């Protein structure tokens, strides 16, 4: 029996862990223990721990990491510190054989650091990708702590190897969030439940930590651009709690646009595939929209450098540029997107490797390969 520790902080990581957890549940020789923290436990971000419960996923531990809810880089640093402080005792109690961490999210960064210090093998999902914000540094730092790497494409694999990781410990498995998307049941009632008319845009714009002071002006430009498309409805999903989020939330709430604090995976998928495009700077616009051939209007630097499909139309934070990108996206509708992040079989591959790979003390001590 291999025991696996997993932590989730927000929808962005939970949506990718969910299909893996479902796959783990099919195996009698595997057992997971889930730690829930961060946005999941915050009312202002939708208290999405309830979505996890609705999915009938077993929750073993919870703790709050955003104690002060401080909208700054200092607040993010404090939250990371809290998670690093809380996790050793949880892991001592869990006694996992391995940790499955992912992406570039703070709670996952924390468990990766703690696991490495406690000599617990760390399996990291989606290392090797290039992004904007502090996420760029976090992701690559996690890769250096991790022992095995489940990359989303060959481009990311090669970058991990160039970072000095052992090539035999790097695997191209695709993006597991696509597995989750394809498993969602179609729900034709979703538009009525959110009072939406077609055509409409989904909008998800997060703050950029390295551009902390500009989040207000950035969302203003996006709102101005969307207002030019009078025949299109819209639904804003409020941002994560990275530094600068309060300004975005205030401006969205002050506008006449519809908004929600958060969406569960099922509603998000059913809205996304019925939309005319995803506007903003979410990684979902890079990883997930190609699955349903939905165009993405990607604004700013947050996803800078990431491998993207032909459905992505980039723009700076400028009203006129955003308008042109939206027009291009509308013209693109009906086309087929390249599937550069896999086709929905990532979870089974990841679980196969979890069962088979060496987790003995032989792999704990890492050394750069050059």
Where are these regions (language model features)?
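Nucleotide-activated sugar donor-binding and catalytic core shared by glycosyltransferases
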Residues: 1-370
């Amino acid at each position: 029996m291999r025991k696996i520790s997993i932590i989730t902080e927000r929808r962005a990581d939970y949506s990718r862990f969910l299909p893996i957890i479902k796959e783990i549940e099919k195996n009698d020789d595997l057992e997971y223990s889930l730690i829930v923290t961060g946005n999941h436990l915050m009312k202002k971000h939708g208290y999405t721990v309830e979505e996890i419960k609705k999915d009938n996923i077993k929750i073993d531990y919870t703790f709050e990491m955003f104690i002060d809810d401080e909208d700054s880089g200092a607040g993010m640093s404090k939250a990371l510190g809290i998670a690093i402080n809380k996790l050793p005792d949880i892991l001592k109690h869990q006694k996992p054989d391995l940790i499955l961490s992912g992406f570039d999210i703070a709670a996952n960064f924390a468990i990766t650091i703690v696991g490495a210090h406690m000599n617990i093998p760390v399996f990291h999902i989606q290392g090797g990708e290039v992004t904007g914000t502090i996420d760029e540094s976090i992701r690559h730092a996690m890769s250096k702590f991790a022992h095995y790497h489940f990359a989303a494409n060959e481009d990311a694999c090669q970058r991990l190897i160039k970072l000095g990781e052992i090539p035999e410990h790097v695997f191209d498995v695709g993006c597991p969030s696509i597995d989750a998307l394809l498993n969602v049941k179609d729900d034709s009632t979703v538009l009525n439940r959110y009072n939406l008319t077609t055509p409409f845009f989904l909008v998800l714009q997060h703050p950029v930590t390295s551009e902390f002071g500009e989040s207000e002006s950035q969302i203003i430009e996006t709102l101005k651009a969307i207002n030019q498309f009078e025949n299109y409805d819209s639904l804003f999903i409020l941002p994560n709690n990275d530094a600068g989020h309060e300004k975005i939330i205030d401006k969205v709430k002050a506008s006449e646009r519809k908004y929600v604090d958060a969406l569960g995976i099922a509603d998000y998928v059913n809205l996304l595939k019925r939309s005319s495009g995803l506007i903003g700077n979410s990684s979902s616009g890079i990883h997930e929209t190609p699955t349903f051939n939905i165009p993405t209007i990607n604004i700013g630097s947050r996803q800078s450098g990431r491998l993207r499909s032909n459905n992505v139309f980039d723009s700076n934070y400028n009203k006129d540029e955003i308008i042109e990108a939206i027009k291009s996206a509308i013209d693109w509708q009906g086309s087929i997107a390249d599937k550069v992040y896999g086709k929905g079989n990532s979870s089974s591959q990841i679980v196969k490797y979890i069962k088979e790979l060496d987790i003995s003390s032989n792999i704990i001590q890492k050394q750069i390969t050059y």
